[in-house]
Amino acid sequence: MGIMTSLRQGDVHRVTAETDVLVRVGLDGCGQCNVSTGVAFLDHMLHQLSSHGLLDLEITATGDTHIDDHHTNEDVGIAVGQALSQALGDRRGIHRFGHFVAPLDEALVQVVLDCSGRPHLSYGLQIPAERIGSYDSELVKEFFVAVVNNSGLTLHIRQLAGTNSHHIVEACFKAFARALRMAIEIDPRRAGAVPSSKGVLEQAGGQKS
């Protein structure tokens, strides 16, 4: 791992009996991406997250994919969420809120999020195919559950249109990337203040504010 140039950076190494996941996220990057999870479709979506969110992203993962992709998919989501939380710190000076509507051909997906420290996922994708290639469509939701619970994001995902499963999921990741980019960017008018009337936004796992 060696492409990081970001000032706000999170590094997580998660090891279990099922997986070994190393994640490095740079919030102030330019979309450099080096990802290898052993789950090809997940890699493709993580590239979308990096490219459209302008996140520098390095991920390596090994897991029990000979059984299925569930553990690797979930543990990558956990580590990505933890790395985002670490990089955001006390969330001082950020815009905090983000939203985007992304099209991909016939698919249209809206994402609205809040870097609130209060994890919540409202998931509204209706993916018609059970699998996209070899990737179980149910794992899309499981990935976002893991990210949300470990990053402290409030995340709403709405599918406005779409019939092609690949298009729906890719539009979702692109919308998430752009909404996240909007939320985590530094707001110069904040002058480094925490974007909350309470004066504090806790990291994931702390007391909610």
From Swiss-Prot:
Q: What is this protein called?
A: Imidazoleglycerol-phosphate dehydratase
Q: Which NCBIfam families match?
A: PRK00951.1-3 (NF002108), PRK00951.1-5 (NF002109), PRK00951.2-1 (NF002111), PRK00951.2-4 (NF002114)
Question: InterPro entries recorded for this chain?
Answer: IGPD_sf, ImidazoleglycerolP_deHydtase, ImidazoleglycerP_deHydtase_CS, Ribosomal_Su5_D2-typ_SF
Q: State the gene name recorded for this protein.
A: hisB
CDD domains in the cross-refs:
IGPD
Q: Which family does it belong to?
A: Belongs to the imidazoleglycerol-phosphate dehydratase family.
- Record-linked HAMAP family: HisB
- UniProt keyword terms in alphabetical order: Amino-acid biosynthesis, Cytoplasm, Histidine biosynthesis, Lyase
Taken from the UniProt entry, a GO cellular component term is: cytoplasm
* Record-listed E.C. numbers: 4.2.1.19
GO biological process annotation, one example: L-histidine biosynthetic process
Q: Tell me where it resides.
A: Cytoplasm
Q: Which GO terms describe its molecular function?
A: imidazoleglycerol-phosphate dehydratase activity
Q: Is Phosphoprotein included in the keywords of this UniProt record?
A: no
**Which species?**
Prochlorococcus marinus (strain MIT 9313)
